[in-house]
Amino acid sequence: METFCGFQKEEEQMDLPPGFRFHPTDEELITHYLHKKVLDTSFSAKAIGEVDLNKSEPWELPWMAKMGEKEWYFFCVRDRKYPTGLRTNRATEAGYWKATGKDKEIYRGKSLVGMKKTLVFYRGRAPKGQKTNWVMHEYRLEGKFSAHNLPKTAKNEWVICRVFQKSAGGKKIPISSLIRIGSLGTDFNPSLLPSLTDSSPYNDKTKTEPVYVPCFSNQTDQNQGTTLNCFSSPVLNSIQADIFHRIPLYQTQSLQVSMNLQSPVLTQEHSVLHAMIENNRRQSLKTMSVSQETGVSTDMNTDISSDFEFGKRRFDSQEDPSSSTGPVDLEPFWNY
């Protein structure tokens, strides 16, 4: 342990390059780390810690490692079950490690340098232990680097253990997920999520009733009970009603509306309507001038006059806009 503590002081002065990940191959673990540890027990590595697997449970190992997110590396000495035997003691207080499958040979070039054993941790005691998702790969020297070619002091048999936890899908679980497991139920608050409904003012379901502006016809049409609609054009009816009910019938504003409307068809409709009103106004002026010369009366009958006064009061009651231009003379428009 003195060596390990001394290494910790040296470790604080070492810097790793950006993006560094400790991801050695099986052959690199044997050649560059385990072989050096067996030759010199004081050897230490930046990314590999030292631990006694018989005194540590697998879920404690991630916090005992020097580094690693999904897998953790340790130097450890295999504990013999019997002093004179070769069987290894793999039991802990909570369970035991059980070997599974066949040992894998590790080569450097064409030379055998080590073996890899796969073990799974079981809770409880054999043979009724409960299998867990904790897995360990144990690396030992073999062949060219076997203990037979090493000094007798290396008989303690150092090994390197790689420990990780598998998920249900067979993937390794990172340590960050292990830390978050207990807090997932409390961190999530559905009330903090933004509303999925669109609060756009354009989605307002309120619709304005269409406004109809009646045309005042002659007495014959009134007797027939026919009511004409000046804006009976399909193009004009397709426009939102709330555009028109906000527009007073003043000359300045009507010109501004016609200029702001973007539809070419709508612009044509307004041009035709404006031309008809202007033509009617000219004919009315011509008729009035003729009547003054000939003495022909231009007075309207009582019914039309009453309708005219009623309509005029309705439009005169509107509030004048800020423009200095007065309201349009609607008399020719009503007579059309």
Swiss-Prot record:
Specify the inducers. Answer: Repressed by the microRNA miR164.
Instruction: Briefly state the protein's biological role.
Output: Binds to the promoter regions of genes involved in chlorophyll catabolic processes, such as NYC1, SGR1, SGR2 and PAO.
Listed Pfam families? NAM (PF02365)
Localization in the cell: Nucleus
Q: Where do the NAC domain residues begin and end?
A: 16-166
Instruction: Answer yes or no on keyword Isomerase.
Output: no
- Domain of life of the native organism: Eukaryota
Cellular component annotations (GO), alphabetically ordered: nucleus
UniProt keywords (A-Z) are: DNA-binding, Nucleus, Transcription, Transcription regulation
Give the comment on domains: The NAC domain includes a DNA-binding domain and a dimerization domain.
Query: What is this protein identified as?
Result: NAC domain-containing protein 100
Region spans: Disordered:
313-336
Which stretches hold the DNA-binding feature? 113-172
| UniProt organism field | Arabidopsis thaliana (Mouse-ear cress)
Q: Name one GO molecular function term.
A: DNA binding
InterPro entries per record: NAC-dom, NAC_dom_sf
